[in-house]
Amino acid sequence: MTFYNCRQFSVLASLGYLLMCGFALADTTAETETDGLLPLYLLEVPDSVDDILIADTSAATMHRFVRSDAGIMHEDQRYMSIGQAGAGKEKAWDRKTPLGVYFITESLDTSKLHDKYGAAAFPLDYPNAWDRFNKRTGYGIWLHGVDHNNPQRPPLDTDGCLSLPNEELLRLVDSLQPLVTPVIVARQLDWASPADLDALRLEFRVALDMWRQSLEQGDLVTYLSLYADDFIYRDMSRDDWSSYKLGVFEARQLAGVALDDVLLVADPEVKNLYLSRFTQVLMTDSGPVTTTKRLYWRRSDDRQWRIVSEDSG
């Protein structure tokens, strides 16, 4: 049996499947050279996030990256099954796995679930605000194990969930934090240089800080200028949002606004779409008001950043 170095990246889903089924394979190494590169999606990871999962659906591989004093490091990888119809979910029961940035919401008691979910199960927050913006439907997308009685699953085998071998998922259980651990689901794992990521991060930070300052200063004109014309918040259009925020700004004076635990990521599917997720602390006369927010940003070719959707949680 050949065991692969966890820092070599699988490019053939069939190899992962055969390994899981116990077949011996000849020595094989990936052609992709990633030395010195980082995942394209990870612009800024806060201290509160220790682990990031990135699912490479084209290679049937789940990668785990960890944050360390030395930066973002590739920790390990494992075989994964996705939806029977592949990736790119658009509607309920299309048996596709959604592409995007998601978060684990909770850990379920699998003793109360069907055997097909295996040793552990973690629901993801599909559909998120960006999915709703695009009118995607469906629900019940989980990261889970496999049936103990039928553990050998091909790469395309679920109803849309991400499925890992039980022993592999159990190795991750202690690392998966509800409402903290990001799960980035991509068609393929793309890379960028640290210098390119840092330049983009600084640009993103400028836009985010402009949003924070305008909120803190009660500058409604600047605040609304950061929202795209096609912005949607739940059932609100940009015009509805503007009217709503006018009332909010007039009614509330803030002594300060802090953004903590800032996570900045690039969407794996849509070019120039980015997510900022953070803990927002509003300093009010009656004390601090703390919420977790997500802003989905679109970056134009001339480097203008505009918010297209937002949500809490």
Language-model region placement:
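Bacterial N-terminal signal peptides
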Residues: 10-22
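Boundary at the C-terminal end of the N-terminal hydrophobic targeting segment
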Residues: 24-26, 30
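Gly/Pro-biased beta-strand-loop elements
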Residues: 33-140, 151
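Exported/periplasmic cell-wall-interacting domains
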Residues: 94-99, 108-209
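Surface-exposed, charged secondary-structure patches
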Residues: 96, 246-294
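Hydrophobic pocket/interface hotspot
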Residues: 211, 223-224, 241, 297
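Short, well-ordered alpha-helical segments enriched in acidic and aromatic residues
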Residues: 217-230, 234
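Short beta-strand edge/turn micro-motifs at domain boundaries
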Residues: 288-313
